[in-house]
């Protein structure tokens, strides 16, 4: 999963609307409230084609029209190195990504799946 956390003052209506509008071609979405914050939780069906960067960009393009703000992003699980390398390394921090979030990195550091 790939989650985009919204700022605390983002309304339920805005998050549900964002989730609906981002859902589609390669992205499944849910709007979830966790504690005092909302997140858009996404399953990226084919991350080599539509990765976290594209998912984030879809939300970021809509946020100004929804009176919403993005707080942070998180990858839940791992991403292939090939999918990560399709994204500019300059964006990794903002997207909550890094080489250590790849399957290959974890395998090379003794993790077994």
What positions do the PLM features span?
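Long, contiguous binding/interaction regions
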Residues: 1-113
């Amino acid at each position: 999963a790939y989650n985009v956390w919204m700022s605390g003052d983002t309304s339920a209506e805005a998050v549900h609307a964002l989730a609906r509008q981002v859902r589609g071609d390669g992205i499944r979405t849910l709007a979830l409230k966790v504690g005092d914050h909302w997140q858009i939780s996404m399953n990226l069906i084919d991350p080599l084609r539509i990765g976290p960067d594209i998912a984030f960009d879809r939300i970021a393009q809509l946020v100004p029209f929804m009176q919403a703000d993005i707080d942070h992003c998180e990858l839940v699980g791992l991403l292939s190195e090939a999918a990560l390398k399709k994204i500019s390394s300059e964006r990794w921090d903002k997207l909550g990504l890094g080489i250590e979030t790849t399957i290959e990195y974890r395998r090379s550091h003794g993790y077994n799946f």
